[in-house]
Amino acid sequence: MAKNTYQPIVLINEALFKLHSPVTDNTVITEFIPYLSIAQELYIEPIIGTALSEELKQQISTNTLTPENGDLIVKIAPVLSFYTVYQGLPFKWATVLNKGVTVRESENSKSVDIKDIAQLRSWLKNDAEVLASQLIDYLCKCREHYPLWMPSDECACKNTYSEGSATKKFESGIFFKHKNKTCNTCKR
């Protein structure tokens, strides 16, 4: 009798993960594989949506990736890589065993403490959020190639800058309350 096993389809391969993640070449990548599918589900799928995610997975599983979707995978890779390390880092530091949670140490190295892990995770998350914003900008600019992508906030694409016009309004840290604009008032 054959076992039913769930095999998630991840959007990036090991080469793309190594290329875009902050881990060193001598890191055992297989330890991050479980966190790859978790990060994909938690952070990438909400950005690209279920329909586009399913299309990418189907094309990856049948090895029929379109050039446009191949470009999208390359844009997804840095975001997914950073979020994967963000998700997996605590479990590289500590291990859950039958006797409890233990911190990994060896004769040649000493683990960092929980404060250091928290700081590293903060840096990883900050970088991942910037990369996620760049992914959304890419999807906005190339929207005609991704008809299955339906952003939850239609106004998000309004603020996307085109190359050479990356100007940003001044933010002083002082908040002046004004009426919220609904998406119906966005001009394209």
List each model region and its residues:
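Conserved short "hinge" loops at termini or chain/domain junctions
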Residues: 1-77, 91-99, 103-188
